[in-house]
Amino acid sequence: DDDFSKAGSIAELTDWNIYSPLWAPVTLDGKWLRLQDKDPFDYAKVERKIPASKELKISFDLQAGQNDKGTLQIDFLDENSIACSRLELTPDGVFRAKGGSRFGNLMKYEPGKNYHVEAILSVTDRNIQVFVDGKRVGLRMFYAPVPAIERIAFRTGVPRTFPTVDTPADQTYDLPNAGDQEPLAEYRIANVKTSSVDKDATAAVLKYADFSHYADYFNGMEDENIAQAIPNAKASEWMEENIPLFECPQ
């Protein structure tokens, strides 16, 4: 679970891979992780590594600053960053899902409005169910088979596939309109939560700070009358550095 309001700076989001170019910056804005983009040749991107899951539930809050420009793609990927499914906010104001070689429209979206998005992905059934504000808006097949889902990426543009292995090494031309900017597009995400419903689900790593008060309570129950290698006053600090906490699937 990611609560961005608890982060003091973008550097504290150590569980995320963040790609933040000058004209497509990623910043924190209160509880929101904000992705902006005015670069016609690049994009902002954030990616979260999660425990490998064959049956995955994910939820997040989503807000678009506009619905007449910009693109936000949400990819669900395996360990090799191969995407099996994609959700997308288009510059035409449509929230859609990719299935096979085609997209299926889910709903229209409005600028500045908060949406609570939930998705259930099944590697076994090769499909994704999408819910917005508690209402099911679509079911789409995966467009690529994957053994498990291990990453979630939010990106303000389409994936780059150029250059290829056959692209000439020497280029004697500039890209058209190099140096120009596009109108600014902005997207915000918050409260990203994932859970695996696999029968043999991989346990999620928990944040020690959420449980440190238990260690402090037990360490303070009795006076420390025997000197230890790690005194009670330092026990919680040592545990945070050396003992990871895991959520045990039921």
Regions found by a protein language model. Name each.
Residues D1, K45, E55-S59, N114-H116, ...:
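Intrinsic-disorder/low-complexity, polar/charged segments enriched in Ser/Thr/Lys/Arg/Asp/Glu/Gln
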Residues D1-I18, A190-C248:
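Extracellular carbohydrate-recognition regions
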Residues D29-A97, H213, N219-I226, N232-Q250:
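Secretory/extracellular carbohydrate-interaction modules
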Residues E47-I58, L106-K113, P183:
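Extracellular/lumenal carbohydrate-interaction signature centered on repeated Trp-anchored short motifs
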Residues F60, G112-V123, I128-V130:
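Short tryptophan-centered beta-strand motifs in secreted/extracellular beta-sheet-rich domains
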Residues R96-E118:
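Short, aromatic/His-centered strand-loop micro-motif at the edge of beta-sheets
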Residues F131-K135:
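Short strand-turn-strand beta-turns centered on an Asx-Gly dipeptide
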Residues R140-R188, A203-V205:
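Flexible glycan-contacting loops in extracellular carbohydrate-active proteins
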